[in-house]
Amino acid sequence: MKAGIELISHSQASHATYANSMTLAEKGPQRLKRQFKEHSSSKESNVSRWLKIFIRQFDIWFPETIPTMKVRYELLRKNFIKEIFNSRAFIYPFLGFYEVLTNPVYWKHILLFAVCYALIFVTIAGLFYVTLVPLLVTWAILLLGPLGVILVHIQWILQTNVLTAFVCRTLVLTHITNQIFDISLVLQDQDEFLNEVKVLPKPQKPHRKIDEPDAVRNFNTIKGSRIFKIPRLLFRMFFKVSNFTSLTLLSLIPIVGPILANQLMAPKRTFTYLQRYFLLKGFSKKQAKDFQYEHYASFICFGMSAGLLELIPFFTIVTISSNTVGAAKWCTSLLKGERKKE
């Protein structure tokens, strides 16, 4: 009898031990899951805390960046779809081309432009032929055989033309293009606008207020120091070099590369052609960029049409001038629209 009772109690104890072990086994994964959730939530809280600190410091040192990005995003969101279907900016380069061919007043400037263009083209073509063409020829012969030599030389002419157009438009011949722009405005009865803007005093930078607190004055002094400007200059330089390098590598693709690079530069090309308009209107760099984002679809349309006209080798001598006239025609349309609103 006692043996039976001991056997029953022993079985009950083992059953209880098994139940406790099963309970602990069931609670183990739950405890691990709970600890993992707590750990992940603590990591998320640390990341969010550091992110908030970074955003706060970014707002302190770059107070205008985030608001400017928000404003430009809203301008894109409101106007892009509407302008992409309604904009007539793509037609102005062709109108300018027709006017340049039919109006002799531009021919003297085009002749001077042609001489400068020829010198720059020969220089860039020689450098390009000595440095990159041998490598491209070797690669093309291995892949395409004798046909590769012909394609490389076509690529050499297209690439040289693209670089020459870029140098002429942005670095060397801006004075000639500014004269062509002003002549076109006068021919379109905008001489009153030119006379007004040329006699207006240049805007001066606002002076510091006398009652400005010392802490604010010291902070602004730190922000305006050269040490603070170095990181921003390095970032901008890195961005420009990366952009230029990527476009250059893209343009090395036979035949198709220069066309793609030409079209990808459409907004930048339009901004370059309208720089004279921004100067005459007295726009700051920020205002000019805001104008670009407000009419970004029109910038793309104008830049693509102007780029196609610039793409034909040696034809660029005429088309850079005609695109400048087209930009002046577009600006005349904008000025007339502003007067109607007034």
UniProtKB/Swiss-Prot annotation:
It comes from the Eukaryota. Keywords: Lipid droplet, Membrane, Sporulation, Transmembrane, Transmembrane helix. Disruption phenotype: A combined deletion of the LDS proteins RRT8, LDS1 and LDS2 fails to incorporate dityrosine and another yet uncharacterized component in the outer spore wall. Residues 1-109, 153-240, 321-342 are cytoplasmic. Involved in spore wall assembly. May be involved in the modulation of rDNA transcription. Belongs to the LDS family. This is Outer spore wall protein RRT8. It comes from Saccharomyces cerevisiae (strain ATCC 204508 / S288c).
